[in-house]
Amino acid sequence: IRVFSVMPTLNDNGVHVGGIVGFLKSIGFAINMFNPTRVIIVFDGKGGSNRRRKLYSDYKNKRRTSYRVNRVAGLENVEDERRNMYLQLRRVAEYLELLPVTNISVDGIEADDAIAYIAKSVIPDGEKVIMSTDKDFLQLVSDDIKVWSPTKKKLYDKEAVLEEYCVTAENFIMAKIFEGDKSDNIDGVKGIAT
């Protein structure tokens, strides 16, 4: 939950619920903005990154921080903060069960892979909007798939990808291969991505 670090909201009992509030607000905003006929929310499955870590042991290795991302009273250290975030994620999943949305998590599969599969294969027809701050999804942009970045408040279609990144959506993954991906701890091609 990225909103965990920017929404230090406490409930009446002093329990940190910023991630829950921020997540549900962003989903509500997207529903109001795009008026979809169906909403699918996808989470990483248990052990979702294991397959990639077997191929490359440093995959996403830099993501575990040793510093505090949120300074909420009552959370004394990074482990308290992580535990609180996971509790909020569990509550978000419980709340989603009460809403008219499809909630998906498949053990051994990262959310990114499930989202790509759903957008391209499970729901092949009609316009789809992927809501994410992860630019990796820009490789999926096509005539019927767009990406909404809630942090940039921008909808990426093929033209927007080309305009911002000077590469077509179809070639976005190739550019990422050359550049590398710091968020996943993957180096680029030496001599090109220096």
PLM regions: where:
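Noncatalytic, basic helical substrate-engagement surface that gates or grips nucleic-acid strands
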Residues: 1-131, 137-155
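Residue-level signal for secondary-structure boundary elements
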Residues: 35, 39, 127, 170-173, ...
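A conserved hydrophobic position in a structured secondary element of the catalytic/binding core
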Residues: 132-133, 192
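Helix-hairpin-helix
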Residues: 179-194
